């Protein structure tokens, strides 16, 4: 999965543990959206996580 272009938040890895306590690999992906963003007055498509979008770190084009 993609990384956030602003905060570089990416996937986290760990184990999924079943009821019988067997472990298998699990990935938690960041909530990343493809967004058109203003960069130096031009519109550019970037992957941005929703926490950066909500906090106003980027300006949509």
UniProtKB/Swiss-Prot annotation:
Domain of life of the source: Bacteria
Keywords assigned by UniProt, alphabetized: Ribonucleoprotein, Ribosomal protein
Molecular function as annotated in GO: structural constituent of ribosome
A UniProt-annotated Pfam family: Ribosomal_L28
InterPro entries per the UniProt record, alphabetical: Bacterial_rp_bL28, Ribosomal_bL28, Ribosomal_bL28/bL31-like_sf, Ribosomal_bL28_bact-type, Ribosomal_bL28_sf
Signal peptide residues on this chain, from the entry's feature table: none
GO biological process terms, semicolon-separated: translation
Record carries keyword Ribosomal protein: yes
SUPFAM superfamilies, alphabetized: L28p-like
GO cellular component: ribonucleoprotein complex; ribosome
NCBIfam families referenced in this protein's UniProt entry, alphabetically: L28
Family of this protein: Belongs to the bacterial ribosomal protein bL28 family.
Name of the molecule in the record: Large ribosomal subunit protein bL28
Organism whose genome encodes this protein: Lachnospira eligens (strain ATCC 27750 / DSM 3376 / VPI C15-48 / C15-B4)
Gene name tied to this protein: rpmB
């Amino acid at each position: 999965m993609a990384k956030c272009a602003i905060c570089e938040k990416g996937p986290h890895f760990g184990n999924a543990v079943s009821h019988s306590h067997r472990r298998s690999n699990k990935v938690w992906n960041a909530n990343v959206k493809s967004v058109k963003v203003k960069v130096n007055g031009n519109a550019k498509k970037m992957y941005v996580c929703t926490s950066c979008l909500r906090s106003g770190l980027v300006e949509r084009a």
